[in-house]
Each structure stands twice: as C-alpha cells, then as structure tokens.
A protein has these predicted regions:
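Compact alpha-helical subdomains of small soluble proteins
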Residues: 75, 83-137
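Juxtamembrane extracytosolic/periplasmic "stalk" immediately C-terminal to the first targeting helix
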Residues: 28-30
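Sec-dependent signal peptide recognition
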Residues: 2-8
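C-terminal motif of bacterial Sec signal peptides marking the signal peptidase cleavage site
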Residues: 14-17
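Mature extracytoplasmic domains of secretory-pathway proteins
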Residues: 60-89
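Bacterial signal peptide processing site
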Residues: 19-22
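Low-complexity, intrinsically disordered regions in eukaryotic regulatory proteins
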Residues: 32-68, 96-100
C-alpha cells in the first residue's frame, strides 16, 4: 500500500512538473522606443551581423517611404508580439515591442525597425508575413 502511494505521489509530481508553464507577466520584457540625446527616435541592435545586413544586403532607405514603412511596421510589430506572447520562437524573440502607430518616429527609425524584421527573417528564417516579397531573401 505504501509503495502504491509513493508511486502515485511520484507520478503526480512528474505530471505537474511536465505541464507547460505560461509566461509570467512580471518576467516579460518589452522593447520600448526611446529618444536619443538629439531628441530623435533610434534603435540599437546588439548584433554585429545586423550592421553587415544593413550595409550589404538590405535595400537602401531611399527605396521606401515613411508611410509605407509605418504601415508595414504596424503589421510586423503585431505579428512579432503575437509570436512573443504565444511563446513561439523563444530562442529568437526575447521581448515584445511597444510601438505606437500614432507616434511620429521618423523615416530613419521606421526603416531600422523594418530592417530588424527583415534581418531576423534573413538570419533565422523566421517567417514574417508583413515583409514584402523582395525583402524575403
């Protein structure tokens, strides 16, 4: 009888420990755009290959308009955050993005944010539906 009890207790502990854990809202990180010392919005990507991607692979900023990038970024940020909050691609997406579509970030910021999504697709193969076909390489 004792053995059966211990076996059931061990089985219960094992079952409880194997259930998927929901992300704790207190531990979630959110990337929030901030202004730099010059009062302009800026993004800092801490990946050495990102600079290479911007200079050698990404289309130049002159190929885009600010309104085009703003529209794409709204969709891409929504897609990114849905991946983050669902727990998919946790090894790639480590934080949510706090993006306000009513804020005027400027062309440079919108371009760099869009290229972050293109870079993640290029480097990790993450499917981002909001990218244009020419930016999916």
């Amino acid at each position: 009888m004792k053995k059966a009890f211990y076996l059931l207790a061990l089985l219960a502990v094992f079952t409880i420990s194997c259930t998927p854990q929901k992300p704790n809202p207190e531990n979630q990180t959110v990337m929030k755009p901030e202004k730099n010392d010059d009062g302009e919005w800026d993004i800092d990507v801490i990946d050495t290959q990102y600079d290479y991607f911007l200079n050698a692979i990404a289309k130049p900023v002159s190929m885009y308009t600010e309104s085009y990038l703003k529209t794409r970024n709204q969709f891409l940020v929504s897609e990114w955050n849905s991946y983050y909050y669902s727990g998919r691609y946790r090894n790639v997406i480590e934080s949510a993005i706090d993006y306000d579509p009513n804020e005027n970030y400027g062309l440079k910021f919108e371009y760099k944010l869009y290229q972050v999504f293109a870079y993640v697709h290029w480097k990790y193969g993450l499917r981002m539906q909001g990218l244009s076909a020419t930016d999916r390489r």
